[in-house]
Each structure stands twice: as structure tokens, then as C-alpha cells.
């Protein structure tokens, strides 16, 4: 069991976690832990060519998982309706820290922000 995971990272340097410490054999320990077994591609989805490349990749995947604020994927031409028109059996999971609707839905959220809001 398992999945072939392609992680899309922002150019030019990819995931900022790659440069975090501590280092293990010159690689960031947290990056190794969180991305073990994943393939990574740097694609700028803010460009037409980047969005086009993502739409081409959809033909080769079963699931798209995204964690942008609600509406970002639609605004980039990469929403569920667009991707499902390309590959009708695509599964898409949209994960956001404050949900898809509500007063805080448009706010970005990461682990430390969620911990602060919940009192951890």
C-alpha cells in the first residue's frame, strides 16, 4: 500500500523547510521527516505556464490535496470543476486551517497559529 506523492513547491528554492535545522547529512531533519518518499517539483502556479503544467499533471494523478486559503485554487484556474473536466475521476481535498466558510476562512493558518488559537 502507499501512494506516489508529487509535492509541488514554490520556485526558486522550494519548501522553506529545506533550510531548517537541525541538519542530517546536510539535509534539514524536519524536511526529511515530513517529506520522506515524496517527489518534489518546483512549479510557480502564479504563472500561466505553471497553471498549465499542473493541469497537465492532473492526468497522471488520482488525488489532489491543497492547503491554500479557500478560493485560491479557483482563482488560479485549478479548482475542482476545472480539474474534474480534465480528469472526471479526480479526487480533491481542500484543507484550510479555518475551514472553507466563516469569518476566518480567508486567513492563512499553520500549526503554530492553530496552537495559539486553541491554547496549546
Predicted regions and their residues:
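N-terminal helix-loop segment corresponding to the beta1-alpha1 unit
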Residues: 1-120
Amino acid at each position: 500500500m502507499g501512494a506516489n506523492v508529487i509535492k509541488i513547491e514554490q520556485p526558486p528554492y522550494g519548501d522553506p523547510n529545506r533550510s531548517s535545522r537541525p541538519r542530517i547529512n546536510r539535509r534539514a531533519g524536519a524536511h526529511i521527516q515530513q517529506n520522506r518518499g515524496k517527489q518534489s517539483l518546483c512549479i510557480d502556479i502564479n504563472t500561466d505556464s505553471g497553471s498549465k503544467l499542473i493541469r497537465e499533471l492532473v492526468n497522471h494523478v488520482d488525488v489532489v490535496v491543497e492547503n491554500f486559503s479557500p478560493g485560491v485554487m479557483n482563482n488560479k484556474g485549478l479548482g475542482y470543476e476545472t480539474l474534474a473536466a480534465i480528469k472526471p475521476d479526480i479526487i480533491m481535498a481542500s484543507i484550510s486551517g479555518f475551514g472553507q466558510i466563516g469569518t476566518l476562512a480567508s486567513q492563512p493558518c499553520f500549526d503554530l497559529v492553530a496552537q495559539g488559537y486553541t491554547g496549546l
